Amino acid sequence: MAPEENAGTELLLQSFERRFLAARTLRSFPWQSLEAKLRDSSDSELLRDILHKTVKHPVCVKHPPSVKYARCFLSELIKKHEAVHTEPLDELYEALAETLMAKESTQGHRSYLLPSGGSVTLSESTAIISYGTTGLVTWDAALYLAEWAIENPAVFTNRTVLELGSGAGLTGLAICKMCRPRAYIFSDCHSRVLEQLRGNVLLNGLSLEADITAKLDSPRVTVAQLDWDVATVHQLSAFQPDVVIAADVLYCPEAIMSLVGVLRRLAACREHQRAPEVYVAFTVRNPETCQLFTTELGRAGIRWEVEPRHEQKLFPYEEHLEMAMLNLTL
């Protein structure tokens, strides 16, 4: 195989691996590129490689996605195979048979590979809105913020980090594993989200602060219930964060007003000390929503500037979406 062709195959395998482990929508997979490569090849080796990068990947075997997702993926893979090859590939059909016999679940795993060779795995609800909240799934701005953090570890190293609206926990877990913070506080207001957060912290080998068996070189990790509308300056002062982050929390005007309110109270906590650095990442879905956020920041006396886009693309998220991150000065 020519070097260029080999590199193309490796990129294709990596794309399938990252998307499958993260349980991304099937339409986001590079199916056309796969079909083209299958037509150029007389054997099924590429499909075997894809199978071992996805369904049979060690991370997937330990923490599989939902049964329905794996079944749909394998069905699509078989379609592509049958379109260009007459000889069946037994491994594909055996893997599909396993999913047909497996029991369905409302939870599934999503895994994200880290540059260190490790990974972050999340147990998530298979429904976008579940238990009356959107916090049980990972949104794309959380992946964007995690990438930025991995590229800028000095912002977090040996510092106390407070995350507002942690959701499933992807950003914080990536920071804890890659950026060596002194302490990390995950926070959310919904009880079901907090329960899932605690589970995901433990799933990734981290210990919650009260655990006396916690590793000495690990950050102190806390999962806190925090309702932005009722949190007082006194309650917020207990966190003493050096850095505050949030991702995909600008989904409606009410949330924006609540976020700006809690940021004002965080600023008041440290009147005799340096205010925390604040980074807010979001997907630009509605320009009016973004405009409202910056307007309310101005009214609150909070300065902001757009953080330059980072270079690394580590995680699979929708490339057509516009992402942005603001650096706020309280």
Curated annotation (Swiss-Prot):
GO terms for cellular component: cytoplasm; cytosol; protein-containing complex. S-adenosyl-L-methionine binds at residues 139, 165-167, 228, 247. GO terms for biological process: peptidyl-lysine trimethylation. Its main location: cytoplasm. It catalyses: L-lysyl-[protein] + 3 S-adenosyl-L-methionine = N(6),N(6),N(6)-trimethyl-L-lysyl-[protein] + 3 S-adenosyl-L-homocysteine + 3 H(+). Keywords: Acetylation, Cytoplasm, Methyltransferase, S-adenosyl-L-methionine, Transferase. It holds the Pfam family Methyltransf_16. It comes from the Eukaryota. It is an enzyme of class 2 (transferase). It is found in: Cytoplasm. Its EC number is 2.1.1.-. The modification N-acetylmethionine is found at residue 1. Disulfide bonds: none annotated. GO terms for molecular function: protein-lysine N-methyltransferase activity. InterPro entries: FAM86_N, Methyltransf_16, SAM-dependent_MTases_sf. Catalyzes the trimethylation of eukaryotic elongation factor 2 (EEF2) on 'Lys-525'. Belongs to the class I-like SAM-binding methyltransferase superfamily. EEF2KMT family. Interacts with FAM86B2 and FAM86C1P. This is Protein-lysine N-methyltransferase EEF2KMT. The lineage of its organism: Eukaryota, Metazoa, Chordata, Craniata, Vertebrata.
